[in-house]
Amino acid sequence: MKRNWDLIRKILLKLEEKADSTSWLMSTDIQGYDFKTVAYHYKLLKNAGIIEALDISTMEEENFAALSLTWQGHEFLDKIRNDSVWNKVKSTVQSKSLDLSFDVIKQVATATISAMLP
């Protein structure tokens, strides 16, 4: 399964807006995606140190519940929160035929934000 960066951004935004730091964001709470895809992305984000998540897998299926953003998660979301910046990042990466990697997204987002400043 490939990483879906729009889903990753959606997860981070949803976790940030969650008022209660003790409640879980279940993989079924993200609309528009099947729970297995969301659970896989929770696992990726947890392994990357971007979110805190619990492994709630059963014998039948892998599943995760997201708890909160880490410091690194907040820092990354700060770079891609703005819709204009996010769309510019995606179009820049695509126009330059770059792979959408975590480091490339951070670099392009930083450059995009810098270009917006006076």
Language model segments and positions:
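Non-catalytic, well-ordered alpha-helical scaffold segments
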Residues: 5-9, 39, 67, 71
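Basic amphipathic alpha-helical segments that dock to polyanions
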Residues: 39-49
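Membrane-inserting effector segments that mediate pore formation, membrane fusion
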Residues: 86-118
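Short amphipathic alpha-helical interface segments
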Residues: 2-30
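Beta-hairpin "wing" of winged helix-turn-helix
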Residues: 53-56
